[in-house]
């Protein structure tokens, strides 16, 4: 199997590349600017014919997206349209995996299935859903993976996990520990597990939308507390919202 991958230098991308290499697949990473269609054309032209393309390239941190929404749309939405346009022209038979997010949904007290209404909880979710729409409209052999709350030891700030690690190392934990969204509930999954799921999807090559998550609800305060043996005096700040996936559709596919 011959694989093309965008976003290979990111946390999930590096893990996927390692796993792809271990399985003996050939791959070619995209190292250009996804906003530049000629960079994508050059990449596809200079590579072997792709059986699979895994599209991870994106601006992800919600704070960065809020600060520069125009750039985020250019990368996450227009960049995706650029990719599918080139693939339609030069590799229309390949299977495309588009990495989206659980942020395309609104907060819900119930588990969120792929059939739930779309109402992005963040600007990041809005940019990724726009990418979904553009990809679905312009490419047939497409699988969209809506990844919920990813964490990994190699992440850097401003993501939650590395931010909390840094605070736990630097702050006096005998004092009150202020935490925005402490009462919010998320569906956390390690990037290693996410990469394994993507590889399983790659083996099946389904079309359609799949939630990629653990299916388990965890309060952010509990996730943070699990990172230290010190009993934290957590002070909750900000609003509460809930994003927990129903993963029945995913489990049914990968367990067939």
Model-derived segments and spans:
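NAD(P)-dependent short-chain dehydrogenase/reductase
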Residues: 110, 133-186, 191, 226-228
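NAD(P)H-binding glycine-rich loop region in Rossmannoid oxidoreductase-like domains
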Residues: 38-75
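Rossmann-fold cofactor-recognition segment
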Residues: 28-38
């Amino acid at each position: 199997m011959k694989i093309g991958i965008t976003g290979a230098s990111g946390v999930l991308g590096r893990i996927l590349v390692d796993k792809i290499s271990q399985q003996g697949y050939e791959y070619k990473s995209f190292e250009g600017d996804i906003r530049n269609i000629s960079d994508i054309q050059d990449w596809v032209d200079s590579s072997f014919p792709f059986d699979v393309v895994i599209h991870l390239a994106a601006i992800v941190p919600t704070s960065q997206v809020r600060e520069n929404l125009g750039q985020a749309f250019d990368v996450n939405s227009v960049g995706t349209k650029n990719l599918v346009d080139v693939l339609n022209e030069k590799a229309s038979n390949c299977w495309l995996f588009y990495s989206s997010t659980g942020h395309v949904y609104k907060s819900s007290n119930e588990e969120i299935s792929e059939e739930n209404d779309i109402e992005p909880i963040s600007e990041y979710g809005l940019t990724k859903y726009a990418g979904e729409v553009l990809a679905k409209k312009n490419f047939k052999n497409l699988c969209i993976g809506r990844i919920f709350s990813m964490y990994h030891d190699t992440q850097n700030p401003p993501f939650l996990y590395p931010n909390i690690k840094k605070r736990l190392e630097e702050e006096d934990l005998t004092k009150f520990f202020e935490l925005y969204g402490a009462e919010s509930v998320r569906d956390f999954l390690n990037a290693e597990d996410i990469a394994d799921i993507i590889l399983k999807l790659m083996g099946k090559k389904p079309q359609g939308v799949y939630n990629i998550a653990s299916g388990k609800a965890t309060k952010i305060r509990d996730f943070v507390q699990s990172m230290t043996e010190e009993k934290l005096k957590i002070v909750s700040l900000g609003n509460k919202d809930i994003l927990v996936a129903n993963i029945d559709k995913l489990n049914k596919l990968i367990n067939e």
